[in-house]
């Protein structure tokens, strides 16, 4: 795991097309802004896991889940 230190207003790059900007820090919460191409899915971890569980349930029932919806 790469660990970086950024201050509010500073940005980091992931590859050539994804930027993550620290928008603000209040207590133990950090607000980040993410710019990425539309084909790159960006989710909070807990939402990502829900989507994955939904896909597993859809596969086991023989139907396809709606994992393409925006959350």
UniProtKB/Swiss-Prot annotation:
The residue ranges crossing the membrane are none
Known InterPro entries for this protein?
CsrA, CsrA_sf
Source organism's superkingdom?
Answer: Bacteria
- This protein's major location comes to cytoplasm
What Gene Ontology molecular function terms does this protein carry? mRNA 5'-UTR binding
According to the UniProt entry, where is the signal peptide? none
Mind listing the GO biological process terms from this record?
A: mRNA catabolic process; negative regulation of translational initiation; positive regulation of translational initiation; regulation of carbohydrate metabolic process
GO CC terms for this protein? cytosol
Q: Which residues form a coiled coil?
A: none
Q: Does the keyword Protein biosynthesis apply?
A: no
Pfam short name (any one): CsrA
SUPFAM superfamilies (UniProt xref): CsrA-like (SSF117130)
User: Where found, per UniProt?
Assistant: Cytoplasm
Which UniProt keyword terms apply here? Activator, Cytoplasm, Repressor, RNA-binding, Translation regulation
* NCBIfam families named in the record: csrA, PRK01712.1
Quaternary data: Homodimer; the beta-strands of each monomer intercalate to form a hydrophobic core, while the alpha-helices form wings that extend away from the core.
Question: Which protein family is it in?
Answer: Belongs to the CsrA/RsmA family.
Its function, per the record, reads: A key translational regulator that binds mRNA to regulate translation initiation and/or mRNA stability. Mediates global changes in gene expression, shifting from rapid growth to stress survival by linking envelope stress, the stringent response and the catabolite repression systems. Usually binds in the 5'-UTR; binding at or near the Shine-Dalgarno sequence prevents ribosome-binding, repressing translation, binding elsewhere in the 5'-UTR can activate translation and/or stabilize the mRNA. Its function is antagonized by small RNA(s).
This chain belongs to the protein called Translational regulator CsrA
Q: Which gene encodes it?
A: csrA
């Amino acid at each position: 795991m790469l660990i970086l230190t950024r201050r509010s207003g500073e940005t980091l790059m992931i590859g050539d097309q994804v930027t993550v900007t620290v928008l603000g820090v209040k207590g133990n919460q950090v607000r980040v802004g993410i710019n990425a191409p539309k084909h790159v899915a960006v989710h909070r971890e807990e939402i990502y896991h829900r989507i994955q569980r939904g896909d597993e349930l859809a596969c086991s029932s023989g139907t396809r889940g709606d994992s393409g919806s925006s959350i």
